[in-house]
Amino acid sequence: MTDSIETMIDRLRQLEDQLEAAFAARAGTHGLDLKSGKPRFGPEVRARQRGHKRRIDFFKTPWPTLLTMPLIYGMVIPIALMDLAVSVYQLGCFTAWGIERVRRRDYVVIDRHRLGYLNPVQKLNCVYCGYGNGVIAYAREITARTEQYWCPIKHALKVKGSHERYAAFLDYGDAEGFVKTSEAYRERLKKARAAAEAKASAEAEAEARAE
């Protein structure tokens, strides 16, 4: 049964990769170019996008929306504090434990403000949402690695929205498995850091040779 579960997890990850490729291909139909590492559109596409831009008209904004704006944008303060807190946390703890730190830029992505069909208010909203969701995803991965290091055990009850590491955790009540393999979960994190450092070193050497 264990092999069957691991096979299903691998299949699920393959499907996720296929979905990402499908999303990228569909984005390409809208003229998106990611070859340079940044989202770019050609002149004709940008002109067409600007033609769909809506004017800002606060008088047409529903009053409940206007009343909730202080609550919405006020959340940037606790989100920024969480951003700082988890960054300091992983810098201290992950370094001490010898495991790979989470790359913030992989989770906090701010790019939707470049879209020509968004007006300034919409761009601000997109920056805010991108930052907020990115920080939460960033913090989630940090806490997921912490959970793998200290308590790689599934819950007895179903958990909605569990992180991707959770599926490989030990079953609830598997005392023998915890005693035998809990240290192996830590070693996986340490090996991941060693592999990441080796990859970074190889890339740096390749860039040096190219220069």
Give, region by region, the residue ranges found by the protein language model.
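Residue-level signal for mature regions of secreted extracellular proteins and peptides
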Residues: 119-122, 144
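A transmembrane-helix-recognition feature enriched in membrane-embedded lipid enzymes
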Residues: 62-101
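Membrane-proximal intrinsically disordered regions of secretory-pathway and membrane-system proteins
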Residues: 1-57, 114, 127, 132-133, ...
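Short low-complexity stretches enriched in small and charged residues
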Residues: 41-48, 82-88, 104-109
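N-terminal low-complexity, charged segments
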Residues: 106, 116-119, 128
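Juxtamembrane inter-helical linkers in multi-pass membrane proteins
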Residues: 95-113
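Short, charged/polar, low-complexity loop and linker segments
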Residues: 57-68, 107-110
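Generic detector of short, well-ordered, non-transmembrane alpha-helical segments enriched
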Residues: 77, 122-125
